[in-house]
Amino acid sequence: MKIISVVGYKKTGKTTLVENLVCALKNCGSVGTIKHLHEHNINTPGTDTWKHASAGADVVIGVTQCELVKFSRENNLTKALDELADTGVDFGVVEGFKESKLPKIALGNVEAINILKRLNKPDSADIEDIINIILEQPEYHTLNSLLAKIRRYRDIEKSGAIGTFTGIVRAAEKETRTEFLEFEEYSDVARQKMNEICRELKQKEGIIDVLMHHKTGIILKGEDIVYIVVAATHREQLFPVLREAIERLKAQVPIWKKEHTQSGEFWVHDTNNI
């Protein structure tokens, strides 16, 4: 999923621009949106869903004849992005969250980081130019988004098994307590190398498709680092390739790790550390 955020002060035309982007992006793939609602409460007090939540339900799902609505106490941007990515959409358009690190299209004189383009008003937007900017953004993936992608592959009907690997940040090893890891990559080279590994592994007998995604930046203890998904005709062909994909990613892809522990921080290069 490629992400863009539209930011601006109130009444600057954010929703109008989001509408225009959604319409244009539909020509490129599936689209989902996220809206920052500030203090607005969707779960209206007194309704049955509100009563469920008030009684202590952590997640409430309401189903009507034309909608499915989920109410959750995990109300932060990362959870919203993961939820959107899990559906398998190709693009995520976010309205608001100007304090985030997301790539942004800014309306008016709003101050924010990572602004890729600034507009005076939505009707002055070159939509084609903005679409090209969005297409250049890195992919945001969850394990479920990769599973959704591999299930859409044209030859998936030949598959009898899908295997996955998820590497997470280990919090404790012997006497060492890790608080978080920090990953840096060699720009587009890392993605190119992962694509090369996937292409080569797909040539093996019985392998339908191979996908992998490695996160960068700061990742807290217990959080996901890397996902690998393999589809194969039979499990006997799947497991050796899944293991080879893990080992080759660790050995060949230019991604570097700094470990932040309770006793200090240091760079690590260890192919056995996932």
Task: Please describe what each predicted stretch is.
Residues 11, 22, 36-39, 65-66, ...:
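Short, ordered loop/turn segments at secondary-structure junctions
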Residues 15:
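Walker A/P-loop
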Residues 68-108:
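Glycine-rich phosphate-binding loop used to anchor ATP phosphates in small-molecule kinases
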Residues 2-7, 12, 38, 54, ...:
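N-terminal, polar/charged subdomain of small-to-medium soluble alpha/beta proteins
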Residues 28-29, 57, 86-92, 207, ...:
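Short, high-confidence coil segments that cap the C-terminus of an alpha-helix
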Residues 100-135:
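Short phosphate-coordinating micro-motif centered on Lys-Gly-acidic
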Residues 22-73, 83:
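N-terminal phosphate/diphosphate-binding loop that engages ATP/GTP or pyrophosphate donors
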